[in-house]
A protein has these predicted regions:
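Short, basic/hydrophobic alpha-helical segments
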Residues: 1-11
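Generic alpha-helical structural context detector
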Residues: 42, 46, 61, 127, ...
């Protein structure tokens, strides 16, 4: 995509797939990386007893409900201590080591925070494509599978779902616009 002209990317949101994060750093070095909050929660839950998942879920959500990055960092440190006290050391280690990857969104306008913490919109599209391809079962070749996926994407683009404005990008460029106006 970079070779075809992709530029100006400021944020990449994904799970912690090593190949993806390394490629992003190599090809889009100016972009920040945001670990999907939902994927992070699932990773933490895999190290928590089933009876404690709900409690830990509330703890993790409290981190991301903070008003600033500093407050979120303080809350995360407190939660790491709480997890260690509750003898969930592996989960505590994971939170301590990786929670900062989920807090990148604090560097962007606060009206965007809710929408850039996860990659759920993309996950929703992928789930829809997967649902359609499972109905078919076996494809005669890769091209027919690609055709079905492309048809589904064309359908999504043509519906009201794709015409809704997901995020107002103006606040993201507002400081740049003000600087440009000051120079002029």
């Amino acid at each position: 995509m970079v070779e075809r002209g992709l530029k100006g990317v400021q944020l990449i949101i994904s799970d912690a797939c090593r190949g993806l994060t390394e490629s992003a750093a190599e090809y889009l070095p100016e972009a920040r990386w945001q670990r999907c909050m939902v994927h992070f929660y699932r990773n933490v839950f895999s190290h928590v007893p089933a009876t404690k998942v709900r409690e830990v879920s509330h703890m993790l959500k409290a981190i991301h409900a903070q008003e600033s990055r500093d407050a979120a960092d303080r809350k995360a440190r407190a939660i790491v201590d709480d997890l260690r006290t509750a003898r969930m050391n592996t989960a505590a280690d994971l939170v301590e080591r990786s929670v900062s990857e989920t807090l990148t969104y604090y560097a962007f306008p606060d009206i965007h925070w809710q929408k850039i913490r996860t990659n759920n919109p993309l996950e929703r599209i992928m789930r829809e494509i997967r649902r359609r391809t499972r109905v078919v079962g076996a494809f005669p070749d890769g091209q027919s599978c690609l055709n079905l996926a492309a048809a589904r994407l064309r359908y999504i683009v043509g519906t009201a779902w794709s015409t809704k404005c997901y995020m107002n990008m103006r606040p993201l460029y507002q400081p740049q616009l003000m600087q440009t106006e000051a120079v002029a």
